[in-house]
Amino acid sequence: MSITVAIDCMGGDHGPHVTVPSAVEYLRHDRDTNIILVGRPEILTKELNALNISPDSRLRLYPASEIVGMDEHPAIALRNKKDSSMRVALNLVKNGEAQACISAGNTGALLATSRFVLKTIPGIDRPALAVVLPTISGHTYVLDLGANVNCTAEHLFQFGVMGATLVSSVENKPNPSIGLLNIGEEDIKGNDVVKQAAGLFRSSGLNFYGNIEGDDIYRGTTNVVVCDGFVGNVALKTSEGLAQMLASYLREEFRRSLFSKLAGLVALPVINAFRRRVDHRQYNGASLLGLRGTVIKSHGSADSFAFRCAIKRAVDEIRGGTLRRIVEHIETLRYNIEQNITQPASVE
């Protein structure tokens, strides 16, 4: 199955210096994928020349004259920059020339422009950002990570459906478990929105584990963790800060004395193995679910390895039929609700 993805090459902290080499390297390992590099041709050509690479049938350039700044207001970018590399890449998906768009650019602008250009799937009110986080038992998918600060119970339910479908399609895991992030496991805990969302999950036939707490995320208690964008973003940023603090503490302790430096040398293989397990770069690429097209948001500061992981995430979603399966599952759930059918609606 041949796949074509469009890359917003001008977005992110490093722009073409990372996106272009990442695309070239990715194509060396995936012969069934084609990439469209979107941006200013003269800049993209310069990057390709530095790599001794010329555009061909698998790697082609598509011109876009404007760039969305990382601190630019989403509404201004949407209204005034119709030829930005971000918007042109999304238009390629809309027009069927590409099956996915990948951008490391301004998150707010990407959310607004994606929703405007691609529109949402019927039955989905709002798109949600889903990210993979490492756990004791492997990894889990968390959504929403910031696309929606204020959510209704129905929104949270839709996030759960999309997250479960993502897991089942990308990882071939039938009927993945769903947990609702709360301040306690008991049914009486949480605000009205969370309580109502729990009721929707219980009556849906989905594999709903129940309420989970923050520490359950990294225990891997469930395959999918559902929360609103405010809670999800705070949880993610808190985790990133904790990881940085622990890394700083370790560096300080191993440099404290000659003995600790020697201990650090002895422990180096273990430390390197630990780093590989928790390396956030391998999880780069947040999926913007709920749109009529595949959109992946890379971290703005991603290096080449991390950006290649974002490309792979897009390709995996396309190969797994994630978008098609979300549409089908939402339609099934809507039909069951309309017909008052109560049999299980498991995600396959």
Curated annotation (Swiss-Prot):
KW Metal-binding (keyword) present: no
Subcellular location: Cytoplasm
Source species, domain of life: Bacteria
Major place of residence: cytoplasm
GO terms classed as biological process: fatty acid biosynthetic process; phospholipid biosynthetic process
UniProt keyword annotations, A-Z: Cytoplasm, Lipid biosynthesis, Lipid metabolism, Phospholipid biosynthesis, Phospholipid metabolism, Transferase
Catalytic activity annotation: a fatty acyl-[ACP] + phosphate = an acyl phosphate + holo-[ACP]
Signal peptide per UniProt: none
Pathway(s) annotated for this protein in UniProt: Lipid metabolism; phospholipid metabolism
InterPro entries found in the cross-reference section: FA_synthesis (IPR003664), Phospholipid_synth_PlsX-like (IPR012281)
GO molecular function per UniProt: phosphate:acyl-[acyl carrier protein] acyltransferase activity
EC number: 2.3.1.274
GO cellular component: cytoplasm
SUPFAM superfamilies linked to this entry: Isocitrate/Isopropylmalate dehydrogenase-like
Family named by the database record: Belongs to the PlsX family.
The protein's role, per its UniProt record: Catalyzes the reversible formation of acyl-phosphate (acyl-PO(4)) from acyl-[acyl-carrier-protein] (acyl-ACP). This enzyme utilizes acyl-ACP as fatty acyl donor, but not acyl-CoA.
Subunit structure: Homodimer. Probably interacts with PlsY.
Name of the molecule in the record: Phosphate acyltransferase
